[in-house]
């Protein structure tokens, strides 16, 4: 039987690798998805772990010097649906299925959604940084 401490030890090792590798938008998005999805695979509860997962998953994004990925409240159901679809497709963690992030290609829908949510923030930051004509 797998216990949370053992799984979290594996998660921390994977997180540290992806944290170090997050240097641009593409690698930061992949680090975000890997950290977030694997965390909720270990802790699939409706007790606030989604908020914790999103906060922790944004650490590599921030480390790369980028603004955080924010799930808009109106997209929350889509976000939860995609997480559950992934979990349903790859199965729960067990002795036979202990990989934290199996079949990453199954994250394509969530990747597309996260990228679209993030693009809004990236555009706001770019707009704030652009020079303005003073009237």
Language-model regions: role of each:
Residues 1-135:
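FIC/Doc superfamily catalytic core
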């Amino acid at each position: 039987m797998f216990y949370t401490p053992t799984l979290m030890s594996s998660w921390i090792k994977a997180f540290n690798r992806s944290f170090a590798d997050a240097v641009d938008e593409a690698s930061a998005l992949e680090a975000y998805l890997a950290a977030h999805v694997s965390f909720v695979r270990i802790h699939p509860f409706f007790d606030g772990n989604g908020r914790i997962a999103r906060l922790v998953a944004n650490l590599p994004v921030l480390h790369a010097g980028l603004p955080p990925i924010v799930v808009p409240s109106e997209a929350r159901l889509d976000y939860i649906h995609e997480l559950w679809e992934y979990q349903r497709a790859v199965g729960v963690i067990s002795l036979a299925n202990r990989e934290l992030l199996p079949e990453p290609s199954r994250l394509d829908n969530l990747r597309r959604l996260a990228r679209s949510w993030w693009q809004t923030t990236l555009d706001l930051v770019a707009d704030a940084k652009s020079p303005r004509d003073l009237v």
